[in-house]
Amino acid sequence: MSRIGKAPVIFDNTVQVSVSPANEVVVKGAKSSLTIGMKPNVSAKIDGNKVVLTPNDDTKESRAMHGLYRALIQNAVTGVTKGFSRGLELQGVGYRANVAGKKLELSLGFSHPVIFDIPEGIEIKVEKQTSLTVNGPSKELVGQVAAKIRSFRPPEPYLGKGVRYAGEQIRRKAGKSAGK
């Protein structure tokens, strides 16, 4: 048995968790709802205010999925109660961000602005023109959106310009040295 999978997922009264016959775990909170589809080799049972997962057989795959689904359900419970966020910083002359409706407009030194459609369930806040925060209940989707925004202009090692995660250290390289 997986060490992570053995531990039950404990949730409070503000969260409703249900298991459907199609082996899907539905986690509902005050603001949002998340669904985790599971393979048939792991089953979930609700026991009071905790979810207990058990592998149905002793194959390598079901042991691996046991821990994975437990972590996914824990992330869903945390997501619907507290939510997840990821900060991004824009470093460079003229690099700006602003949100207009469900679109994020980025000026990243290209000849055109980069327009990004904000997915459903994700909220992007622009604190300053050079820093923004991606918020949402799904840890996976928040990370995916932040990575997509970063991929428009990843930080380059010589000047450090680009979109970086908040607090990310960029490994800098020395420029050309003039030879004699």
UniProtKB/Swiss-Prot annotation:
Q: Does the keyword Transferase apply?
A: no
Q: Which GO terms describe its biological process?
A: cytoplasmic translation
Annotated signal sequence range = none
The organism's place on the tree of life at top rank: Bacteria
Concerning its family, UniProt says: Belongs to the universal ribosomal protein uL6 family.
A Pfam family of this chain: Ribosomal_L6
The record's note on quaternary structure and interaction partners says: Part of the 50S ribosomal subunit.
Q: What is this protein called?
A: Large ribosomal subunit protein uL6
Q: GO molecular function: any one?
A: structural constituent of ribosome
GO CC, alphabetical: cytosolic large ribosomal subunit
Protein function: This protein binds to the 23S rRNA, and is important in its secondary structure. It is located near the subunit interface in the base of the L7/L12 stalk, and near the tRNA binding site of the peptidyltransferase center.
- Originating gene: rplF
Task: List the keywords (alphabetical).
Answer: Ribonucleoprotein, Ribosomal protein, RNA-binding, rRNA-binding
